[in-house]
Amino acid sequence: MRDLLLGRPAKDFDIVTDARSEEVTQLFPGANLVGAHFGVVLVRSDSHTIEVATFRSEGAYSDGRHPDQVVFETDPAKDVLRRDFSINALLLDPETDEVIDLVGGRADLNRGIIRAIGEPRRRFEEDHLRLMRAVRFAARLGFDIEPTTFKAIRELAPQIHLVSPERIREEITRILTEGGASRGFELLDATGLLHELLPEIERMKGVQQPPQFHPEGDVWIHTLLMLEQLPSNPTPELALGVLLHDTGKPPTFRVADRIRFDGHAEAGVKIAREILTRLRFPNDTIDQVLHLVANHMRFMNAPKMNASTLKRFLRMERFDEHLELHRLDCLGSNGRLSTWEFVKGKLEELPAEQLRPTRLLTGEDLIAVGYKPGPQMKTMLTAVEDAQLEGVIHTAEEALALVNSRFRP
């Protein structure tokens, strides 16, 4: 209902009813009973899966996530009162098209307010992930968090550690990718959740940068500006790359002829790995994010690269994400896109066969003409590929002649 009233496309539809789960499964024989204790049934309709839940009230939450007791109800008001925020507690009567608002959710939608239902501390202590959900909804919708709700989040922020890393990971990913990422991280900071979850990001605050390259200010501001420029529906890897690419700056900060962060990309890889591992991101996500962090400074040298180095650079896996990270890096600092335009132009100019040409020689070819297997063979093949990428050689005969001239005793 929330998204429909805001004029946004609704991603899914949930149904609440006084019917018990066994009645629902009788009506829909193919339905899947996924939460008998909670009266939740999944019903397939065409290509959609709809969650059908029985009205219920709940007892205390001893574990901070699951209610100790569930009572099935016939009164929708009791069901609504257990929900997290007023804007998520609006119901639509399908027979009359009447919006049923029992907690002031429609007024909060109109005012742009995220407000916990009832006593905020109790709502958050029922499920501590709601601390982050409040931030996500405020960021994505461009809403403010109601003062009493905000105060409760700040007071309970240390309890976010009671939530599993996997659930925190999913919420961070959604904050980064569903819109309003910059606002989301400002709110994580303001509520104290950033301090609890990502102290490495918090350390960016106040770390100044050379003004000739970063007139925007410190590393924190730079990162927020990049998050603000993220395209719609970015991949999690790109969004995480933006968030983490400069985590190596605080520990490498020094003042010499100017402010410098020598080796910050390498330091950032180590820090990013610690964060992503702590939050239990999958290995393929970790690998790509670390690749983005490790290579983000290479763009500054792209116009000076020789042909072989540039072509190898351009053929990095998922290079589009590297290129987009660089564009955002520029937009979040001095705004100069000349290097991005150069690299993008080269990418469009060079056909795939020039970036990844067919190999002229293999190790077997070299063994066949008398070379012995060993570490030097890799050096030989790299030299051949360099010359091929540079356009110096074009045939197997030329490649073998090059090897003989350089490596034959």
Predicted regions and their residues:
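Catalytic cores of the polymerase beta-like nucleotidyltransferase superfamily
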Residues: 1-409
